[in-house]
Amino acid sequence: MKIVLRRMGYGSLALLGILLLFIAISFANHTIKLKIESAILSPPGVMVDVNNHPMHVYIEGSGEHTLVFMSGGGTSSPVLDFKALYSRLSDQYKVAVVEKAGYGFSATAKVPRDIDTMLEETRTALTLAGETPPYVLFPHSMSGIEALYWAQMYPNEIEAIIGLDPAIPQVYEEYPLPSFGMRSLTGLGARVGITRFFPDIVNSSAAIEEKRLSSQEEEIYRALFYKKTQTLNMNEEVKMIRNNAAQVLERGIPDVPMYFFISNGEELPVEDWKNYLVNYIESVKIGRYHLLHNGHYVHDADPDLIAEESIKFIEEL
């Protein structure tokens, strides 16, 4: 029996050694690749200092209205993710994409992810980039919560909200969130470069899968994906989302015009996703919605329709 236990112990140690060796090799490879990839990662917009950490704001176009794009949780490259849609709007309007801490070209920073802090950082970043309200907000997914809060707290700053399959507070009463252990494990895996061994993950990103980017932009997108996946800020947002959503829910529905583009809900772990969003928008004083037959990244799947409908809606404001 002792011999068996001893052999099991040796086997466990051997497996642990192999695992640690794999992690070390992965991390070394990741570090080298990050250094190489840094040569192509030049921010296309302006970098501003907010709460002692650099944030990236990309601005394109000009016009009477300023459209602010707000990325969903975990989107590694908001500027490229939204490109298919804002490039169809920037000939008529000014477009701004704010990349939160831990996203895109913005630095990962030890900052709270409560909704008040995130909103003030977004507003400050826009101000420092030379932009002034009012804005038309284009939030995707989780940023729907921040957009609604913005309209609740500063209604004079918001002309309208055009939601890209946006989350509303009620969905987080049902939405299954990953555990602390799972967030820590996936975050560690991303930081040591294990994601590089699974290229299908980045290849399945909507902007790439829908072929919305040039070959050079795809290269930049991949580099940002490997650098900014499951960052500390992204994981902290997930940790705080139920509290943030509850805070927005308490304040009711803001009185601003809204237009929701709603996905088929099949990529989301909430059975009644579509109904949640439809019920919400039907309670809005000036509210419209469009049911789409595609996945969660609606702006990559159907940018032509969304751009056309958004222009009509904005011109009626």
Regions found by a protein language model. Give the residues of each.
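Helix-rich cap/lid subdomain of alpha/beta-hydrolase
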Residues: V171-R222, T231-G252
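Active-site loop/oxyanion-hole signature of alpha/beta-hydrolase fold enzymes
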Residues: V97-F138
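Conserved serine/cysteine hydrolase catalytic core
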Residues: L213-K285, H290
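Conserved HGGG/HGGXW glycine-rich cap/lid loop of the alpha/beta-hydrolase fold
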Residues: H53-F105
